[in-house]
């Protein structure tokens, strides 16, 4: 419900505990849950203050409890609080591309105001059951290892696991680039509770690789929304919803395919846990909020395919103390359709993208979804790589010569497969000097089938390293010999 400026009700702060404010309103003028409140005024130094809060609880005696979206420094009891009469609204549409926003939808990149009148509330219902697109279709990423072994579902949710320095950011940027080129889609990146330095690095790398076009900002392919580690828990808890709301506009109004990146979904849960404790709720298992599954479901259910378009979400998942049974990652796993695991071992060999072909999984890799040819090819690739992994200890101790003829052949093919799973990226052209390659699924399956059949046994394994399709490997072999 929208309320005109004249009829906005106002209250007074009665208590401040860190980022939590209690506000008293006149009888009959109480704001609704999730309404945005604005505290305005001057602090003791005479500086203007403007803090936006979100109503979380109605306490009785005409009092509400709200959580601040920015620092509460300088606020005092008795300050006037205005009720906006509606939830937080953020700008949406093409004007958001190439820009950086905070949780309130305010631009923080010093490039001036956002040129759009379109705004949407961050609290919205998930698409109705009748609007959902129930077709199971593959979202082709153009990245061989992903499309073959752990394919993404259109409108699905993918968990991205990987430590520092194994190529998460480059993989994310390549996916943003590929969805723009191959699907005519756009991307939204939600930085939830991660380091400010990482957010800054990502922005700079996106400008360098052309994902954000500085000279013509409207040509950019991504909108960035940041609520970093130093923000109050209210901002970190809501920044994911701000990013999701921007993505929903592209799906529902522009009818596009959208990629939504959330880095890191664990920090969303962590912020919810902090807010829950500040509001005095009884903690649940391992100290998490009792509403953990509800909050996670509220976010994840809005990420889906409709008959108009799709939001495919890639979520970085931090696993505390590597404990997969911790309630935060365990609740996240229930929603995931695929996992992409990045391996430090592959990165140390120089094989990029360093996606682990044996640890990465997908519910889409079923013969009745992807077809028998794709399924069989993927299974054969995995079997060959698994056998190579089992033989590695023997090779390390006794050497290749002690293996049987059959095993030596498997090792040779597995090493070719391992190298053929690498691929030059468009966004890494600046560093590698090799032009990026988008490889279609048909070319990927054909290439791996030929390696497995033994038709390419006479080609050197180096010919398969950092190439796109098989034709490039064959021509590279000709230059090597």
UniProtKB/Swiss-Prot annotation:
Keywords on record: ATP synthesis, ATP-binding, CF(1), Chloroplast, Hydrogen ion transport, Ion transport, Membrane, Nucleotide-binding, Plastid, Thylakoid, Translocase, Transport
Superkingdom, natural source: Eukaryota
GO biological process, any: proton motive force-driven mitochondrial ATP synthesis
Main location: plastid
Lipid bilayer topology: Peripheral membrane protein
DNA damage is among the record's keywords: no
GO cellular component: chloroplast thylakoid membrane; mitochondrion; proton-transporting ATP synthase complex
A GO MF label: ATP hydrolysis activity
Binding site for ATP: 162-169
Catalytic reaction equation(s): ATP + H2O + 4 H(+)(in) = ADP + phosphate + 5 H(+)(out)
Entry-linked InterPro entries: AAA+_ATPase, ATP-synt_VA_C, ATP_synth_F1_bsu, ATPase_a/bsu_AS, ATPase_alpha/beta_chains, ATPase_F1/V1/A1_a/bsu_N, ATPase_F1/V1/A1_a/bsu_N_sf, ATPase_F1/V1/A1_a/bsu_nucl-bd
UniProt-listed Enzyme Commission number(s): 7.1.2.2
CDD domains, sorted: ATP-synt_F1_beta_C (cd18110), ATP-synt_F1_beta_N (cd18115), F1-ATPase_beta_CD (cd01133)
Subcellular location: Plastid, Chloroplast thylakoid membrane
Family, as annotated: Belongs to the ATPase alpha/beta chains family.
Subunit and partners: F-type ATPases have 2 components, CF(1) - the catalytic core - and CF(0) - the membrane proton channel. CF(1) has five subunits: alpha(3), beta(3), gamma(1), delta(1), epsilon(1). CF(0) has four main subunits: a(1), b(1), b'(1) and c(9-12).
Free-text function comment from the UniProt entry: Produces ATP from ADP in the presence of a proton gradient across the membrane. The catalytic sites are hosted primarily by the beta subunits.
Protein name: ATP synthase subunit beta, chloroplastic
Protein species of origin: Chlorella vulgaris (Green alga)
Record gene name: atpB
